[in-house]
A protein has these predicted regions:
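N-terminal acidic, proline/glycine-rich, low-complexity intrinsically disordered segments
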Residues: 1-6
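Beta-strand-dominated extracellular/periplasmic modules and repeats
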Residues: 14-288
Length: 288
């Protein structure tokens, strides 16, 4: 398996940002979900965010040159189509933490900007769509879906992840549609088996506005290797998570701050070089 040693090429980063923004614009549900938010809450949130900005300006004595550079950078985030990337990398992990702190079942983490709904169905046991000769270590994943009381759930696991070079289909050129994206339906016993490849760690796109922030701040752009999942079952809360691999140096300093110890897998290595993993999901019933 190869890992990405350089940032995504410029065309891929630009296309990635444009695709993420376009897909978000086609989904009106975020606007509908908050349409009834009371003005008082909107005012409180806006005032507190602005107050935090004002406090930072005063504390660090921000200059006009820095202020104008900030304005130019904020404009470039929109021009580069990188608002989804910016928010998902640096903000979403706290939103997810607050939204799911009541759960008794599995803990989740961020969705990230590269989810695409309606991936191909593959049943309870199947192989994720991939190219002939797909590069990467073969990985077989066995698991179950149950409710918090232990009842098996015939739910679904939507799986998507990067390839062995760190690229996602639908967001990078020269990849087949739905490559390494699939939906698996657990059987009546809640069991599923998925065959895929182990993804690579990668850097988020660095040729746009987010990359300029990373360079100016002296940060790194790496995300550890991970599998994205959405796990659902009727009458239960949707679980969005990422599953990680042991030994990845960026499990400790993920640019997106999304790694949790309980989300790190324990793969078994077989004589032929392939790997297998067992990881199951416990879903919380929906609250009335």
């Amino acid at each position: 398996m190869t890992t990405l040693e350089t940032p995504m090429d410029a065309a891929s980063a630009a296309a990635s940002g444009a695709s993420a923004t376009a897909r978000f614009h086609t989904d009106k549900s975020p606007y509908d979900a908050v349409a009834g938010t009371p003005p008082e809450r909107v005012s409180d949130l806006a005032r507190e965010v602005l107050s935090a900005v004002h406090d930072t300006v005063r504390r660090h004595r921000v200059t006009y040159d820095e202020y104008n550079a900030l304005k130019a950078w904020l404009i470039s985030v929109g021009e580069d189509g990188e608002w989804p990337l910016f928010l998902d990398v640096w903000v979403e992990h706290v939103i997810e933490e607050v939204a799911t702190d009541h759960r008794e079942g599995n803990k989740g983490t961020i969705e990230g900007p590269y989810y695409v709904p309606n991936s191909p169905e593959r049943g309870a046991r199947g192989t994720i769509p991939m190219r002939d000769g797909e590069q990467g270590t073969p990985l077989v994943w066995n698991g179950t879906i149950t409710s918090t009381d232990g009842t098996p759930l015939a739910g679904k696991v939507e799986l998507w992840h990067a390839d062995a070079d760190g690229f996602y289909s639908q967001f990078a050129p020269n990849l087949p549609e739905w490559n390494l994206r699939g939906t698996f339906s657990a059987g009546p016993d809640g069991a599923f088996q998925i065959t895929t490849i182990r993804p690579a760690p990668y850097q988020i796109p660095t040729d746009g506005a987010c990359g300029k922030l990373i360079a100016a701040a002296g940060w790194h752009a790496w995300r550890p290797a991970h599998l994205h999942v959405k796990v659902s079952a009727p009458g239960h809360e949707l679980l969005t998570a990422q599953l990680y691999f042991p030994g990845d140096p960026h499990n400790q300093d993920d640019i997106a701050s999304a790694v949790k110890p309980e989300l790190v897998l324990e793969p078994q290595v077989h004589p032929d070089g392939s790997q297998s993993v067992a990881y199951s999901f416990v879903l919380d019933p929906e609250k009335n």
